[in-house]
Amino acid sequence: ANTNLRDISSVAVRISRQVRGLAEPLLRALWEPDGFPSTLVLAPPGVGKTTLLRDMICALSDGDEQRPACRVGIVDERGELAAMYRGVPQLEVGAHTDVLDGCPKALGITMLLRSANPQVIAVDEITAEEDLRAMLSAAHCGVALLATIHAANREELARKPLFALSLIHISEPTRLRRI
């Protein structure tokens, strides 16, 4: 623990909320005959990316009449998706979901690939090169990726040096679509 904090000028408190059903129209539009495709949710800060991601995870994990349940692995580095307490998610993330809480994304993605047999791996707010490398590795193993990133649109994302090349490697241009 960092005990060197002092002279604090402000504190920001984020209160997460669950919005069940939020992801349903999006999942209907994305779902393909062979399952869930890798999906990157782009939006500016503060508009609900994490709330949407959590509901997508829950819906994929639980399944319904149109979609079978998926095995989902979450790498919840900052504890915002599942809000784990004593090993139990305090927010709904679905019945078939494994959560790695407080684990760095790159390490967690690798751990899930090796031990959890996920069909989908979900992470919130990707920012680091090592996270992208781990995601590319997972994509090459046949696992669908579900992630969020701060960007208003594809053009802004393409201007981020870290992601410009990765966009080409992760998805086929014919499958890029705006929903």
Task: Give residue spans per PLM region.
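Hydrophobic anchor at the beta1->P-loop junction of P-loop NTPases
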Residues: 41
